[in-house]
């Protein structure tokens, strides 16, 4: 019996893992995703952020670099915070064994594995809960693994560990409440928080409700019983948080400096949509929502309609259980629809796209209820099956009449009707014992697999060209490989695929797109006329003056540059490397009144840059051209050969088209409301440009020519006594500088409390210069300076994590020894009983 039991259990667990994996691989074959073709599964942020960050992580591991800081993106970032937000899954460390050219595939097939593990974890939970190991548990595990949530968000690889761990955390909490055993709960929740704190916030909020629900269902016998349960829940929850403290604390400190670090509680209550509209999204083939609309992605098999109704009618399931689980499910539906609840669930923020990120918990709940109905189906009558079938079909027909969402195609309703009829027929045959159990299981698995394959294939797995993403990588590496590395400088790609190209190709850069982006740098970027938004800033719109201030020594161009003011270095195929002749080091000296004198509040960043040159006593670098405004069009003609820029003064204009008299071709510039200069490049005299917007808004724009002679003046003034870098590594910078009276060392290193600075061996507190950068007030004379980065909260976090793990180990040892003592006593007692019986 034991081997038979294991076979059944393993059968269900293997099916729950391998069927979703096989379905995903089948879809990959159809989509020609590598190695089955030349496409890749780089969807949205996976394309722009995750692939570069995984590349940077792998590079650091393989080259023995610190995981605390990175120079390759954002002018320098707290990598421990970026790691905590994007990379903290323990499975990600396997990337050290992956070759560089397969980083995308490592991510892609890790997603597939995690989808399979999600199904396995859900099935394991249902087996442990029901103490049954039949194949039926796998049906609901497959539904969990290939849910609408996964169809919408499976590319969000950083969330998937939490999806896997949720059933195990729930099982651990049930053991804690019912058996007073908290180790599994603390370990699984600790792993979840460590892997992704953001999704774990939602899990923790759910656990509070679930803890109360478990107490209600179990029944509380006394105040003492209640107090002990609450104390244990709080204690093991704190231990779980403590386990993750080493990763979590640096992340918390870093997020305080982001644009998302503030809270704006909604003042008006708004309902987004009706319950019918939401529940209709349980149908297969419904297009997923990942944009700014609030629709939840809650599909997990259309059979849910049948089973939830059967669950509510089943007399073997207690009324208390039904009330608790149904109430929790309704609360989740309300949370999807009501803005205040939506705001709270998302960590007291409105999500910037990717709505209803907590909906996987709702899916877990409804699948549990569906499984309970399946498990107790023998208690349902044929009449109840008929009522559930009619109710399900009736709801689908009602939804077809009332739902007006764009996500519902013609076939959604008909496929749902057919599938409900098939599942109802299978249940009827099972009820009447007119079908062999093995045949029933196989038929159900086949139909369920077809449904899940169709839904995932229709609503998920978009692709991009793998070749296009990687085509210039080898050439970029070739042009950079022979550059000297004895001092610090930055690069920028003129034509980028992402803002995080520096991380993808491992060179020091300015641009960054990350949820950990510092708000101060975004603000400063806009002031200087380079692109910036809530969680990103880039070199787009940069002038040579900005490049100079940011220590951008080299530009990586696709094709040759016609600008005579940059110096050719080398090229590889169509990738060219040019050197900017005027580049300041990572630090430069300014006078004591520099920061207060520089006015960065001008409407135009051209005025901001010119004001900088004015206060250091040099000529303006951006010279305004004469132009004409005519409704939604602005035109100007270049007065002489040079580098030209256009700035759109109206931030309500998002997209413009620029046409030159030279080629008469429209060039579209998007997101100009992000405050960046439109770089027209180096052009001849007498070229007429027209700038227009198609929204018929009044065009308010200005054109400028850049003056390289003025740039040299500014460079000579700021580089009189430069900061000379003598050594630097992934978290340290050392150098010397000869300061005048009351001069300030202004760096292009983003300010962070984690920097520790020593001036001539004496620890010196740095300050925030220009509200953005690391700055040092120096005394007159030559100084040796050392700067080292250690994230805020790292050492306290290590102590807390170490202490929490130690406490868990001691608890485990204590209960293990206690169990051995009790087992020994029981054995001795049985021996005594046997001896007495023999006498």
Task: Please name every model-derived segment.
Residues 22-122, 142-163, 195, 202, ...:
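Membrane-interface coil-to-helix junctions
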